[in-house]
Amino acid sequence: MGLMQISLFSVFFLLSLNVKAQNKSKENFNFPKDRKTNIAVLVYDGVEIVDTGGPMDVFIKANNWNGNYNIYTVSASADKNTLMDGGTFNMLSKYSINDAPQADILIIPGTSPEIVHKVSSDKKMMNWIVKQNEKTVMTMSVCTGGLILANTGLLDGRSATTHHWSLDELRSHPKIKVQETTRFVVDGKFLTGAGVTSGIDVALQAVEIIHGKEVADDLALGMVYDRYNTMEFLPKK
């Protein structure tokens, strides 16, 4: 075999290894192939509007890029009514935590710190999160939804983030590796967003994991969203 042939063989071999490395994370996310992927967004009184709508809109639009998503909200209230942030409007969910199907992707939006403490004391809702997480392919949080997720104990031993005003509270969980100045963190099947609009970043990252970077970038372009923005605007400590 000549030097040129050896060189080309080496290049193709290295490229094949690189492809496997890029696909390795995808192989860990076993989404259903015989039905739509269930995406459940948990809502409760006082839930933040952009936290809720941002990720939902990403997955709704991803259906135009060969996505196969069944997106729905799940209310913590038995009557399926949820009073959104600021008392601006009522959302009537398709399901409540009493009758919701098993989610493949579970999204937990955030709210004010006061309401975080209130909903975290709702044992039925917190147990529902834990039970759903047993079979989710991905579990995501947005903003202070990371605190709700942390209060279940599911983030223990994981890297995670939350809204920059609530990082100290996240640090009160000593088993969580708190990440600062980042818009989102991916650790295993857990994706945590920093705050409000970062829910869009988290959802786009999920799309990238599932469909590839090109699809996620095209989707962001269609949404007129810069998915490569930074946290440089935060006040320096």
Language-model region placement:
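A short beta-strand/loop micro-motif in the catalytic core of glycosyltransferases
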Residues: 139-140, 160
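Conserved Rossmann-fold dehydrogenase catalytic segment
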Residues: 179-194, 224-225
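Bacterial Sec-dependent N-terminal signal peptides
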Residues: 1-24
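A conserved active-site-flanking secondary-structure segment within enzyme catalytic domains
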Residues: 155-182
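Extended, subdomain-level signal for the structured scaffold at the beginning of enzyme domains
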Residues: 21-139, 147-151, 168, 178-180, ...
